[in-house]
């Protein structure tokens, strides 16, 4: 990676979003997905480029934390949806981004609010070209106000 080193927690956040998406679409359990990421996705060399290292402990905490607290996390997200919208109406990737971000805001007070929101908005931008990143920014900001004020 040319000079622009990605932080291990940033890599862990992206991996957690991917893992949450994988669990939702495949029905796989959190422990098997964490194991798969550890064995096959972290510390890889792709086309001669070493992928940035992930904070694997942080990744596992995010994935397990979302699964353990998903009902409460989803309640916080649903409060941010337009009237008549259901969580299932959102794209599965957007749900994964929101769930991971909401988990950090609600349960990881050691991580600054601005860092959490910025990281997940950037992840959203890597998946979406439309208004989704703006929605995710607004939803996470509102969740942060509820959880941290």
From Swiss-Prot:
The gene is nusB. GO terms for molecular function: RNA binding. Keywords: RNA-binding, Transcription, Transcription antitermination, Transcription regulation. This is Transcription antitermination protein NusB. Belongs to the NusB family. NCBIfam families: nusB. Signal peptide: none annotated. HAMAP family: NusB (MF_00073). Involved in transcription antitermination. Required for transcription of ribosomal RNA (rRNA) genes. Binds specifically to the boxA antiterminator sequence of the ribosomal RNA (rrn) operons. One of its GO terms (cellular component) is cytosol. InterPro entries: NusB-like_sf, NusB_fam, NusB_RsmB_TIM44. It comes from the Bacteria. It comes from Caulobacter vibrioides (strain NA1000 / CB15N) (Caulobacter crescentus). One of its GO terms (biological process) is DNA-templated transcription termination. Gene3D superfamilies: NusB-like (1.10.940.10).
